[in-house]
Design a protein with these regions (language model features):
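Substrate-engagement module of ASCE P-loop NTPases
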Residues: 55-66
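Active-site beta-strand termini and strand-to-loop segments that position acidic
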Residues: 11-14
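Conserved P-loop NTPase catalytic core
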Residues: 16-20, 27, 33-37, 42, ...
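Non-catalytic nucleic-acid-binding interfaces of large nucleic-acid enzymes and RNP effectors
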Residues: 5-8
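Conserved helix-turn-beta segment of the N-terminal RecA-like "Helicase ATP-binding" lobe
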Residues: 1-3
């Protein structure tokens, strides 16, 4: 068997890798050391605290990945709108660089409208 599972996670014993849900409260996430963080429904996060903890938790990794899956939501002051705004600037640079665009080859964005 390549993977094992239990009620807490899916894991690969040979490498010590695991996929498991973690708290949505940033105060309970200190000490993480992750390769990948997945945030579901980013628009529902009232602050950017969880996002910042995940960014910090990937700091020791050369090819870390953080991504969000979300619907738009309504909060134009939150982390979701901030990421959306950044994504649009990166996407604008893809085929037609302009002064309002950002070149960031480390950022992938896909927006369905």
């Amino acid at each position: 068997r390549l993977f094992g599972s239990n009620k807490l996670n899916i894991h690969q014993e040979r490498t010590g890798s695991k996929f498991e849900p973690v708290a949505s409260d940033a105060n309970n996430l200190d000490g993480l050391n992750i390769h990948c963080g997945i945030v579901d429904e980013l628009h529902a996060h009232k602050t950017r605290d969880v996002w910042e903890v995940l960014e910090t938790a990937t700091g020791a990794r050369l090819q870390s990945l953080i991504f969000a899956i979300t619907t738009a939501g309504f909060n134009k002051e939150g982390i979701c709108y901030e990421q959306r705004d950044y994504a649009i600037k990166v996407l604008k640079n893809f085929d037609n660089p302009d002064p309002l665009s950002i070149k960031d080859d480390s950022y992938f964005a896909l927006i369905y409208t």
